[in-house]
């Protein structure tokens, strides 16, 4: 899992950092980078001195417009850190770099919106007409994902678990990109955490 090139979703990355280890200094520009920690504690530190620490239940957005150089590393000396990052192209280029961080709502049994244009309360703002939702679904659930925009593409990613979408089975760490106006029906075959990323094509 890495570069997708699916509409405005440039990449979806799963990363595991060993205790005390990290990703060396690197640069980003003109990208909305959404970090979703799954276990452990992740620390971001940039060349301007800004530091952010995130843990499961948090969501963090780096809007790297004009550009920023930063490090990411596991803040724990004894626990691995596992997280997802979605990279989405922004609507506007070369805007001032900014950060946003929030705490997600309880996503048990249904999808909760965690990142969207405008943002509000527990939804962090991103500079794109894209919508990122997360759910924890019990086995036997059958539900329809309701799209925010008919013309948008939808990428469904199973963090862990197993589900069926239109007779296509997805399991741990696999995803499916969907194009079309229909909102898909998800049939949950095992307890699952599911990430849905809806983006303009």
Name every feature range the model reports, one short phrase each:
Residues 1-27, 31-32, 83, 104-146:
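A short glycine-rich, His/Asp/Glu-containing loop-to-beta-strand
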Residues 1-75:
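Extended, compositionally biased flexible segments
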Residues 21-28, 45-46, 71-75, 123-126, ...:
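Short histidine-centered beta-strand/loop micro-motifs
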Residues 29-48, 56-59, 139, 145-166, ...:
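Glycine- and acidic-residue-biased ligand/ion/polar-headgroup-sensing regions
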Residues 48-63, 106-109, 165-188:
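Short acidic-glycine-tyrosine-enriched beta hairpin
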Residues 49, 64-94, 180-201:
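Ligand-binding loop in jelly-roll beta-barrel domains
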Residues 153-154, 160, 174-179, 192, ...:
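Intrinsically disordered terminal extensions flanking catalytic oxygenase cores
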